[in-house]
A protein has these predicted regions:
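Glycosyltransferase catalytic domains, chiefly GT-A lineage
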Residues: 1-265
Length: 265
């Protein structure tokens, strides 16, 4: 299997889902970088741990205040910043084993039955593995983001949205020139937009008309010319959107096989 690091993050409202996802990854002995973006001390201490899992506490003082997850979910701006943090460490790694790792961002609501299929798809693709989400960019991107980036809504408005739930970056397995392009064309500008509130969350935007990190990722994927993947959960062995609303009322304590059956896709 191509070496892969799974990256994720959660605050208290996704603690239960994170425990389930980390449990699934521990059973696969996966390499994981897990970021605490707002867990209580008790929750952080209760997370599954194993040798391949590195736990980080997100360093909020280093970043603009709009990343605060307690205010409008931090505009989801912490996600591109975390992805860039991991990718930049891989790019500068002295250890060859670390430098060969690809990166898979996975929202805390994902659940893994396998790693090899998605690792193979990332390594064998064009450099960025990403699927589509519902609707078009015109429907789910506030015009202020296009204004900030100085690009035409007409040029991108009819294009499909990218799904930022599960995104793979072949930064370790790709040839150096392609890995550089992934960083230059996707990772770096995704982070730059996330750090600028007028870009990732322009005035007048909300979850009713904008998809923050996903909106700018969609633009960058289209601009760079990456193709969307069509892989299903059956092929990948990864389920997404397992953090369904009813778990808020009934809890996340179900056995893993039952929990995984309730994932959206």
């Amino acid at each position: 299997m191509p070496p892969l690091i799974v990256v994720t993050a959660a605050s208290s409202n996704h603690f239960g889902a994170l425990v389930q996802m980390l449990g699934s990854l521990r059973r696969l002995n996966a390499r994981v970088e897990c970021y605490d973006i707002g867990l209580t001390a008790g929750e952080a201490g209760a997370l599954p741990r194993w040798n391949g899992c590195v736990h980080h506490t997100f360093d909020y003082p280093r970043y603009p205040p709009h990343l605060n997850v307690n205010v409008n979910a931090g505009e989801y701006a912490w996600k591109p910043v975390i992805v860039a943090d991991v990718v930049e460490r891989i790019r500068s790694a002295a250890n060859p084993d670390d430098a060969r790792c690809d990166v898979l961002w996975a929202d805390a609501g994902c659940f893994f039955h396998a790693l090899e299929p998605v690792a193979e798809r990332i390594a064998s693709g064009e450099g960025v593995w990403v699927r589509t989400s519902a609707g078009t960019m015109r429907q789910w991107t506030h015009p202020g983001m296009f204004d900030y980036l100085r690009v035409s809504l007409d040029e991108y408005g009819g294009k499909r949205n990218a799904d930022a739930t599960l995104v793979g970056f072949a930064v370790g397995s790709a040839p150096a020139s392609r890995a550089d392009a992934i960083y230059r064309d996707i990772i770096q500008p995704w982070k730059a937009c996330a750090l600028a509130k007028d870009c990732i969350a322009p005035a007048g935007s909300s979850r009713a008309n904008h998809r923050q990190d996903q909106a700018v990722l969609s633009y960058l994927v289209h601009k760079a010319g990456y193709a969307f993947a069509a892989d299903t959960r059956d092929r990948l062995g990864v389920r997404c959107k397992c953090d369904r609303w009813f778990y808020t009322y009934i809890g996340f304590h179900f056995p893993a096989p039952l929990y995984a059956r309730c994932c959206l896709y």
